[in-house]
């Protein structure tokens, strides 16, 4: 069994996608469909986590992180399905300074994706859903 290191929590009230979110770490914001919304928050979480994992993989390989300055951009898209349901899709775009000098870039990206906790969550490997009465 995995050892839990810590937990962060956030609570949504009001209109859901057009409501309010308050949580640990100073999160206290209104959500809007065209502004800060769940997709934007997911993209920010994944980009930050993935870039950290990528830099760790680079260091483990002896790659100079400062020289290559990785930039990870997470894109989270909101889809309407043919059956009327909703779905999210996501992809990561990574750029490096001096990329032509890097070896096995795809291997680095794959290692970071395998290590990144948010990537694991997106794959559904570690999602637990519990419904509790109020």
Q: Model regions: which residues?
A:
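Extended beta-strand/beta-hairpin segments
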Residues: 1-44, 51-134
